[in-house]
Structure formats: structure tokens, C-alpha cells
Regions:
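Residues within alpha-helical segments
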Residues: 14, 18, 32, 50, ...
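Low-complexity, small/basic-enriched stretches
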Residues: 15, 70-71, 75-143
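Short, charge-enriched, intrinsically disordered boundary segments that mark the beginning
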Residues: 1-11
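Basic, amphipathic alpha-helical hairpins
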Residues: 12-25, 45, 66-74
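Basic/polar phosphate-binding segments, predominantly the helix-turn-helix DNA-binding elements
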Residues: 1-2, 24-57, 81-97
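Short, basic, alpha-helical segments at the C-terminal edge of helix-turn-helix-like DNA-binding modules
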Residues: 4-6, 57-66, 104-114
Length: 143
């Protein structure tokens, strides 16, 4: 029974995050929306989604930012459209999640050295791509 309640809570939280990521809701705001303590919310969200609410929000934000950068060359304008107030947050988010700077992303990786390889994992074969800053792509294959 608790499992069904938690599924519903996390489904509601994910929907809320998708619809409101531009406001960059805090852990406290999310927990209040769901109706449980921030500690409990953090624990069950991470258990069900596989990442923390903060990481989930960062990934929603970076995907929206990448989409905005397709339409504009102005990084500040793109950042504002996705709810980020500072250009430094955009830079940090790109490097942390994509392992490239916003400018490198915008130039489609021109001049960056990418290394790649394959590895067997418990989840199947994994294709990994990295830059000097870290892993920038992972894909699993069932072939």
C-alpha cells in the first residue's frame, strides 16, 4: 500500500517539476506540494527516480536550455527563458552535466577531443564518450 502511495507522490512531483522547472522549485517547496517532510520526500524521490530531486531538476533545466540555444545565440536570454538568473549557473550546469561549456555545445563540439569506448556492464554493453572534463554521453545497447 505504501508503495502505491509513494508511486503516486513521485508521479505528482515529476509532473510538477516538468511543468514548473523554470521557477526552480526548492526541496522544501516540492515537499510541501506533495505534503510530506523534505527529508522523507528526498529519500523516496531518490529511491523511485534513481536521482535526487535537485539532479532531476538540473537535467530538465539543461535539456530546456539546450533547446533554447538552438533558437538563439544569446546565452543570457536563453538562461532567463529557462529560469536561470546568472550566466555562471549556466556554465556550471553545462560543465557538470554535459562535460562541455555552453560555447562548446553551441559550436557542436568544434575543437574538443572526444574519447570513446565500449564496456560490458550488468545492464548490457555500454558506449561511453568523454572529454577532458568528464563523461558527456553514455548509452546502453541490448545488441
Amino acid at each position: 500500500m505504501i508503495e502505491n502511495i509513494n508511486y503516486t507522490r513521485i508521479e505528482k512531483a515529476i509532473q510538477y517539476l516538468v511543468e514548473n522547472f523554470k521557477q526552480q522549485p526548492t526541496l522544501d517547496e516540492l515537499a510541501q506540494y506533495i505534503g510530506i517532510s523534505p527529508f522523507h520526500f528526498q529519500r523516496i524521490f531518490t529511491e523511485w527516480a534513481g536521482v535526487s530531486p535537485k539532479k532531476f531538476l538540473e537535467h530538465l533545466t539543461i535539456e530546456a536550455l539546450k533547446q533554447e540555444l538552438q533558437d538563439t545565440s544569446n546565452l543570457i536570454e536563453a538562461a532567463e527563458k529557462v529560469g536561470l538568473s546568472a550566466q555562471s549557473r549556466v556554465y556550471d550546469l553545462f560543465v557538470k552535466i554535459e562535460a562541455v561549456t555552453p560555447q562548446e555545445y553551441k559550436s557542436k563540439g568544434a575543437g574538443i577531443r572526444f574519447e570513446y569506448g565500449f564496456s560490458a556492464t550488468p545492464f548490457g554493453e555500454c558506449f561511453i564518450v568523454s572529454t577532458s572534463r568528464g563523461v558527456c554521453e553514455m548509452q546502453f545497447s541490448d545488441c
